[in-house]
């Protein structure tokens, strides 16, 4: 018997299932038709302004779960503030310049050799590529349910943005904070450009740690009285970058450390007393004796012979020397190390800077018999030569953390080249003081960024590429003197505001510069233009000025920056440095960071593991609200686990 007709059951037209993948696009379309975002802001007119400044993603690929997490958290805050007595506009932004975009654009266009096309043709390819991905990402972010000024975002390639960027550069340059110098920088031989610290990723790398003997040629009369035979007396250095040995010009010791003269067989070695046992063990030498000791400062200005190049390596002192590993006698190549460069440049200006490696990562003629080899080939060849000539003291295989290029993932070099720098030292104390006035969430963020700023070197802001904002510097045709003048840079800013930065590659210097511009050094009136572009971290580092300070419905400084924890060394820091240089204070009142999205087992998502999940997969199958629910229920300060089980569970329960 059918009892259905006898039961008084409730009836409703309300769907038993949410059907989010189909219903959400309809709801979103109605939001935009009804101008919900604009209506909310209009309703909040007259209320206190709250500005969350959006960190710009790169417009060169599809969005991933990390960006989905980030944009959703921002949307929660913007909505909450608009419902809590504030007027909270949201201006999304995009970072559009840089090497990754250039390489992907060239690949898409089938241009394998960038020199095969003109500057303007290359820049056109890159612009179209970036704007295409900007549209795709914008649609993806809108599909996630985010409200904001999607039709009027800030974009780093727009004329008004580039003009403001030149203004900030000009302010910094005229304050003496921008300079050109020959200094060791991270250099990617694959991409053939300098890199900033924020563009470096560390990975484990197998290598050889090598101990090398440098024969003493002048002991200042201190070692022979202890019984040393100078013809058989050596300083023993230690390094993990064998290829830099052709650049060695000095041996650095700690001035306050104790150094021993060690006899083993018929040879004599100078090394730190505290490291003698480990060094002799590495060489397999068990029968040895210490004949005497000296302070490091006593060794200063002793001389040694380079083991395979006809050159003297001077013994110098430096406070950067440690007794953590090696021999306490530091191989010093100022052309390939920041600390080496600093100690030589500041205290031993007579020591030459030798850079026997070219932009492709190959040894030059200055490397002697190793010329033409790659650095990897040179590692093996030099070690073999040292062994053959008796200059090898010991060699061990180790695995260490080594810097790699963020783009090509290959090992980078430290290499001295002429680059443009921002003087961080000049503003470091002011920046650290400003950090104290910012609210950091989590609280440990303050210590983290403070230590990073305290320890960082001057910021290399030049790149040897063509897709980016040109460095607005001119050079005298006669004497080569750089022209760093406010009027000249103002002319560039106004040109970019009117025509965009492509004009730099179209117009001659004389068409850009104010009439009557002369070289201050020689009076010449003819100039050439700088070929390098600015680091993309400088682009994003000035967004606080180009957006928050420029749009009259926002304010500066921003109330909040919210990004992943990797931005302590990236956007948070570049924004802070440009802001301190420009206005002497931080560009944000509060900074919040979130963790990474990892798989259900806590592993990083990657193609090799096959554990990656695209936001679009979740949205298409379950709906954006389910993804938003996952974000809302997660502790975003730590790494967040995600699997399809995490996503499907709320759907099943509903």
Q: What do the predicted segments below correspond to?
A:
Residues 250, 257-329, 338-342:
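Protease-associated
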Residues 69-72, 373-377, 513:
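Aromatic- and glycine-enriched glycan-recognition loops and surfaces
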Residues 218, 347-360, 465-467, 486-639:
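Alpha-helical recognition segments enriched in aromatics with Gly/Pro capping
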Residues 17-47, 280-285:
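Histidine-rich, glycine-flanked metal-binding segment
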Residues 42-104, 237-246, 315-343, 347, ...:
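N-terminal catalytic cores of NTP/NDP-binding nucleotidyl/phosphoryl-transfer enzymes
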Residues 89, 246-292, 393-424, 648, ...:
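Structured, non-catalytic alpha/beta "coupling" segments that mediate domain-domain communication
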Residues 44-47, 55-56, 89-102, 153-161, ...:
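Short, solvent-exposed turn/loop segments enriched in Gly/Ser/Thr/Pro and often Arg
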Residues 2-13, 17-20, 26, 30-34, ...:
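Residue patterns forming the tRNA-binding/recognition surfaces of aminoacyl-tRNA synthetases
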């Amino acid at each position: 018997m059918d009892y259905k007709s006898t039961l008084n059951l409730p009836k409703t037209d309300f769907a038993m299932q949410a059907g989010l993948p189909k219903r959400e696009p309809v709801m979103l379309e109605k939001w935009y038709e009804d101008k919900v975002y604009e209506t909310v802001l209009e309703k909040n007119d007259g209320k206190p302004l709250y500005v969350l400044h959006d960190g710009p993603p790169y417009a060169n690929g599809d969005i991933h779960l990390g960006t989905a997490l980030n944009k959703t958290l921002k949307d929660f805050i913007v909505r909450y503030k608009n419902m809590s007595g504030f007027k909270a506009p949201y201006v999304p932004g995009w970072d559009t310049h840089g090497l990754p975009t250039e390489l992907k654009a060239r690949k898409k266009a089938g241009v394998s050799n960038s020199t095969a096309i003109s500057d303007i043709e290359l820049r056109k390819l890159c612009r179209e590529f970036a704007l295409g991905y900007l549209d795709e990402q914008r649609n993806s972010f809108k599909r996630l349910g985010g409200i904001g000024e999607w039709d009027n975002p800030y974009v780093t390639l727009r004329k008004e943005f580039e003009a403001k960027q030149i203004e900030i550069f000009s302010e910094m340059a005229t304050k003496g904070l921008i300079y050109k110098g020959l200094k060791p920088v991270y250099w990617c031989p694959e991409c053939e450009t300098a890199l900033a610290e924020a563009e470096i990723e560390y990975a484990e790398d197998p290598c050889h740690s090598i101990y090398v003997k440098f024969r003493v040629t002048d002991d200042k009369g201190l070692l022979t009285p202890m019984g040393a035979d100078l013809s058989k007396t050596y300083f023993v250095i230690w390094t993990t970058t064998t290829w830099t040995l052709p650049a060695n010009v000095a041996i650095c010791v700690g001035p306050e450390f104790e150094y021993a003269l060690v006899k083993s067989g018929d040879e004599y070695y100078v090394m730190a007393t505290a490291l003698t046992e480990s060094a002799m063990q590495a060489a397999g030498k068990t029968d040895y004796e210490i004949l005497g000791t000296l302070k490091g400062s006593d060794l200063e200005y002793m001389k040694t012979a380079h083991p395979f190049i006809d050159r003297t390596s001077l013994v110098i002192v430096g406070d950067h020397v440690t007794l953590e590993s090696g021999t306490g006698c530091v191989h010093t190549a100022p052309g390939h190390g920041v600390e080496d460069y600093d100690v030589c440049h500041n205290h031993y200006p007579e020591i030459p800077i030798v850079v026997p490696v070219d932009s492709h990562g190959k040894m030059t003629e200055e490397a002697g018999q190793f010329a033409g080899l790659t650095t990897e080939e040179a590692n093996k060849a030099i070690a073999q030569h040292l062994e053959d000539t008796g200059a090898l003291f010991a060699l061990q295989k180790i695995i260490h953390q080594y810097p790699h290029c963020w783009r090509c993932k290959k090992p980078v070099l430290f290499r001295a080249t002429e680059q443009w720098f921002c003087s961080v030292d000049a503003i470091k104390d002011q920046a650290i003081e400003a950090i104290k006035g910012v609210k950091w969430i989590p609280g440990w963020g303050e210590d983290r960024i403070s230590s990073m700023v305290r320890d960082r070197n001057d910021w290399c802001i030049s790149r040897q590429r063509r897709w980016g904002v040109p460095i607005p510097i001119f050079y005298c045709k006669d004497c080569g003197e750089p022209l760093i003048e406010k009027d000249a840079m103002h002319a560039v800013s106004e040109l970019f505001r009117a025509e965009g930065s492509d004009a730099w590659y179209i117009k001659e210097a004389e068409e850009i510069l104010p009439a009557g511009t002369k070289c201050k050094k020689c009076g010449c009136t003819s100039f050439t233009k700088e070929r390098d572009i600015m680091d993309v971290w400088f682009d994003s580092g000035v967004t606080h000025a180009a957006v928050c300070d420029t749009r009259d419905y926002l304010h500066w400084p921003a109330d909040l920056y919210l990004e992943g924890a990797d931005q302590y060394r990236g956007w948070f820091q570049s924004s802070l440095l440009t802001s301190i240089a420009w206005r002497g204070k931080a560009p944000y009142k509060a900074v919040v960071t979130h963790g990474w999205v990892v798989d259900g087992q806590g592993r990083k998502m990657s193609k090799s593991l096959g554990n990656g999940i695209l936001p679009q997969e979740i949205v298409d199958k379950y709906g954006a609200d389910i993804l938003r629910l996952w974000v809302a229920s997660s502790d975003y300060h730590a790494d967040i686990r995600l699997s399809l089980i995490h996503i499907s569970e709320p759907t099943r329960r509903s």
